[in-house]
Amino acid sequence: MTENEQIFWNRVLELAQSQLKQATYEFFVHDARLLKVDKHIATIYLDQMKELFWEKNLKDVILTAGFEVYNAQISVDYVFEEDLMIEQNQTKINQKPKQQALNSLPTVTSDLNPKYSFENFIQGDENRWAVAASIAVANTPGTTYNPLFIWGGPGLGKTHLLNAIGNSVLLENPNARIKYITAENFINEFVIHIRLDTMDELKEKFRNLDLLLIDDIQSLAKKTLSGTQEEFFNTFNALHNNNKQIVLTSDRTPDHLNDLEDRLVTRFKWGLTVNITPPDFETRVAILTNKIQEYNFIFPQDTIEYLAGQFDSNVRDLEGALKDISLVANFKQIDTITVDIAAEAIRARKQDGPKMTVIPIEEIQTQVGKFYGVTVKEIKATKRTQNIVLARQVAMFLAREMTDNSLPKIGKEFGGRDHSTVLHAYNKIKNMISQDESLRIEIETIKNKIK
């Protein structure tokens, strides 16, 4: 990369980071690369699924950086992974044929869903360790964490990660013997083979795998047909003894798998246990920003933030909300999804789903003020003494965490401040919490008073 190309690309990244939320930047921009700038055309390498986002949101960034560095209008030519020939062990491997090879494999054997990958999994603080462990397992199956046990509530991405592990291994080794199956289906297969007196076939099928991916293992903990846990125990031992990778997911920790034999619980804890929790606001915004690329509608930022505030339990609710909105927008022949349209579309889902308590921002300001010994008037004003600034930033942080208000709306409630001020306060307090345990306890105490 020439000096001018480096300056240009650094400026593109700088402008993008200043305009986007951190989680959005990390997902859509961080992994992109500038290959060259030739004849006023910037060739940029990125994931193909992110092209539409760049076209919609970063054109002005490219133009600005282009005029600053080259004093010219720079256009963009996007290059995708499947277009690049990657030399590996002196063999050129093209990603597109690899993907075709994956799709052409007998899916009845692995039952993997090819749409799930690490590349399209949105990372946040709530799932970072689970993702890192999953990637490590996919890179060196059977040697790193065996078994890998991922637990968390429904709709948080456990099934996505299971399939991503399998697909990643299969891309590197198309001959790998992989099986994705729910614990419920494992039980069903066991019952069928018992009835047909073909247990040898079941043993052959599962005990000679290279990678076993079991979803919702808690189903095995139910009181099932005698011998099911015994068979799974023997399958587990056969695979583990041969250094074959096992990955399990559950809605609870191994120790809370009631009615499961102790010897199985013990084995589930041999490797690594990681937790996935509900996505925070910033991750939900990134998830929505990614998902709306699948729809032919315009979603203004305030609409995205509104939706992110409405559903805080899992990703499936967010996906369902977008489907509801698509239905209403198509019926009304609307191109731009305003907050009002979104609210109308998701009304039934909100009534049927878990209710979010509506917390006035003024209540947050009041409780924060009482805790830190300042008035609401001081929180809204411009005075910058240390205790008032801390109270103000904590109140902004909680307003974003505990309400569905957009950043501009929150800023308005704090003396008409700009949305960037709110975002700065939110990021600052979030960073401080990760380093200051006493502040984290203070904020939890305030949250409990508000609730």
UniProtKB/Swiss-Prot annotation:
Subunit and partners: Oligomerizes as a right-handed, spiral filament on DNA at oriC.
Residues engaged in binding ATP: 155, 157-159
Protein name listed in UniProt: Chromosomal replication initiator protein DnaA
Function: Plays an essential role in the initiation and regulation of chromosomal replication. ATP-DnaA binds to the origin of replication (oriC) to initiate formation of the DNA replication initiation complex once per cell cycle. Binds the DnaA box (a 9 base pair repeat at the origin) and separates the double-stranded (ds)DNA. Forms a right-handed helical filament on oriC DNA; dsDNA binds to the exterior of the filament while single-stranded (ss)DNA is stabiized in the filament's interior.
This protein's domain notes: Domain I is involved in oligomerization and binding regulators, domain II is flexibile and of varying length in different bacteria, domain III forms the AAA+ region, while domain IV binds dsDNA.
Gene: dnaA
Region feature (Domain III, AAA+ region): 111-329
This protein's GO CC annotations: cytoplasm; plasma membrane
Organism domain of life: Bacteria
Region (Domain IV, binds dsDNA): 330-451
SMART domains: AAA, Bac_DnaA_C
UniProt-recorded Gene Ontology molecular function terms: ATP binding; ATP hydrolysis activity; DNA replication origin binding; lipid binding
Main location: cytoplasm
UniProt key word ATP-binding: yes
CDD domains: AAA, Bac_DnaA_C
Location of region: Domain II: 77-110
Any one of the GO BP annotations: regulation of DNA replication
Family the entry assigns: Belongs to the DnaA family.
Organism: Streptococcus pyogenes serotype M4 (strain MGAS10750)
Coiled coil: none
NCBIfam families: DnaA (TIGR00362)
